[in-house]
Amino acid sequence: MKHGTNGIVKFIFVLLGAVLFCVLGLAGFIFFHVSELKKAQPLEVSQEEKTAALKTFYSRHKINFDFPPLNSIENFLPVKSSSSNIAPSAKKIELPKIDAKSYILIHANTGTILAEYNADKIIPPASLTKLVTIYTMLQKPEFKDLEKIFFPPKEAWAIFLPKGAAWIGLGENQSLSIEELIRGMAVCSGNDAALAAALLTEGSLKKFTLKMNEAVKTMGLKSTRFEDSSGLSEKNQTTAREFALFSLHYLKQYPENLKKFHSVNEISYPQKHNILIKKNSDGLKEFQIKPATNTLLKKIEGCDGLKTGFIYESGFNISLTAQKNGERFIAVILGGQGKSFTEGIFKREQNSIKLMNFAFDNFKSFDIREHNKIKRSVSVLGSNLNVKTSAFIPLLADEDFSQDYLTVFKNDERHIEQVIILPDVIMAPLFAGQQIGRIEYRIKDSDIVLKTIPLICPHDIKEGSYFRKFIDGFYQFF
């Protein structure tokens, strides 16, 4: 009996030793596994993977990557800290008084709205339409050759325009380049040039306006539509917000047009090389000097565009841009009033000067490129990845115009703080483009968030085995 008891005790000790050995072995394995997991090097991301992840993110969040929206004014409250003793949120900035039915002011560097009034009110754009005409024409590959010569269609000759309509003087026995045609629209608002652009591009005004409407629809402009290419029709419609967004996209795509077309103070047409037969055409003389309709080119420092417009149904409109010290702003003012044409132009000038002075006096860009270099990796638990590469560095998925800059009040950089909201670990499965965190730029000691940049997973990461999930679960204990 004694020998039997000893045998059982011995067996139990052996069994316990074996169990202890297994437990210690498993613990050692888990410890080693978790140690490797914590030292995991992030997976490399190819350009193809990055592009695919961003496309997935934008698609799921219904964001137009090619034509992002403006930054909502709710994300940029009008606050100003003029003293280090005053919290930034304590002072409200005073907006300029603008005598118009509608306006909006944006920072072109970031797409941030700085001021607005009735910005969604639908108003005929008048000759601002010609900006969309220029854009639509340049979208067609054959019209990107600005030196291309053509003959103005008879339907677009100046003599057939309504009385009082602006023109450059297209007529018979003439030829001109695409560049001259665009300059005629941009500088002196030639309605004959706008009609010629439509006919040359699509063969008919109806087909061309369809292209115009397709272009603005692609940009997400829901209230903007066109019935003609010149802006003479009161049936054309837009809003200050949407036209500011269009103007910004136009400048992003064709920045060279500012110098080539929109900052030109005057043009002469027709010139000698435009006349095919050396005789006057329908009374048009050579070298007719036509000044720019944008009178702000000479009255606002740094002003280099864009376009003015007027019909009785709309009032005095302008899409204005100016740049100084690397800061560019865009203002769209619609429905300016005036008892006379001269008074209307004067008020438009005063409104424009007020908005641009307000912009340049108060706002600037804050470079956040260095801050946006995320070096912190996220460990992935319960995946099928090699333990040594079970981590990734998230991608920035900024749907705004620029993730490189932030619009701030002058001298307020010291009040800005960056907050990275990102988990240290995350469970598989994950898909490329999945948002897993964000960067926030805030005003210190306030609840004001100036900018949010989503952080997304760059890879498709599959779920691992039950055993992998089990041992990864010990991550938090080491």
Predicted regions and their residues:
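Alpha-helical transmembrane segments of integral membrane proteins
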Residues: 10-14, 179, 259
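Intrinsically disordered, Ser/Thr-rich regulatory regions of eukaryotic membrane-trafficking proteins
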Residues: 19-22, 86
